[in-house]
Amino acid sequence: MHHPAEHSPLGKTSEYVSRYTPSLLFPIARAAKWAELGLSAATLPYRGVDIWNCYELSWLTPAGKPVVAIGEFSIPADSPNIIESKSFKLYLNSLNQSSFDSRDALRAVLEQDLSVAAGAAVGVRLRSLDEVAEEGVGRLPGRCIDELEIAVDGYERPRPELLRCDAGRFVEEQLYSHLLKSNCPVTGQPDWGTLVVDYRGPALDPASLLAYLVSFRQHQDFHEQCVERIFLDLRRLLQPQALTVYARYVRRGGLDINPYRSLVDVAPDNRRLVRQ
């Protein structure tokens, strides 16, 4: 079965266009991947958002002077489509030699184009470099599980059977790991990420969580689907009162992708981590 992204610019030699070209955006329907997980648009068990940060955003003023900013794009997790990442990059590059009357004018164009591609309203923030620098590098709350000793004998597929919990002990905690890795389903390139699990429910065995996350190491899928799979596997095991799964992926091509899935209100912290 062919992956829908095979028809996108991903993995292909592309001409870089420097004049505004919204047709470069390549949407990919979420429905097929939802179906693989037993979901549909009507049965999504989470709320969420995919936050994209762009560090290579530039355009021209009417006088021809370049402007730079850091873009933050929030795509609802229940939108009909994701936007293929290379097409997103090519689209943003097409702004480089294009003139806009103001920052607000550009933001309106971005909101319009990205919302059409995603099939839902996309939030856009254009942030100054000083503003983002002032935030600094974020530090994760909770416990890092990466120093736990585990034995690993499989990397080819996610292994939810490794997950364990103590049904007799109820906790509220945050666990995180920097060892998440999966591969692009089209190019096979590695995607490196940090994963945060914030939950209230039966105590999750942290070593089993680490072994489970490592089992994604050779798995091929997009960032968004990896996080949704992790969310569903943890929800199935824990039946928690609250659960949030949040991944912060290392940037590629000037873009990083940060999927957030939760049983509760959507309130992600978008400060970049040290590898971003």
UniProtKB/Swiss-Prot annotation:
Catalytic activity: 7-aminomethyl-7-carbaguanine + 2 NADP(+) = 7-cyano-7-deazaguanine + 2 NADPH + 3 H(+)
Key word Glycosyltransferase present: no
GO biological process: queuosine biosynthetic process; tRNA modification
Subcellular location: Cytoplasm
Family: Belongs to the GTP cyclohydrolase I family. QueF type 2 subfamily.
Reported function: Catalyzes the NADPH-dependent reduction of 7-cyano-7-deazaguanine (preQ0) to 7-aminomethyl-7-deazaguanine (preQ1).
Quaternary context: Homodimer.
PANTHER family the UniProt entry points to: NADPH-DEPENDENT 7-CYANO-7-DEAZAGUANINE REDUCTASE
Descriptive protein name: NADPH-dependent 7-cyano-7-deazaguanine reductase
Organism of provenance: Pseudomonas paraeruginosa (strain DSM 24068 / PA7) (Pseudomonas aeruginosa (strain PA7))
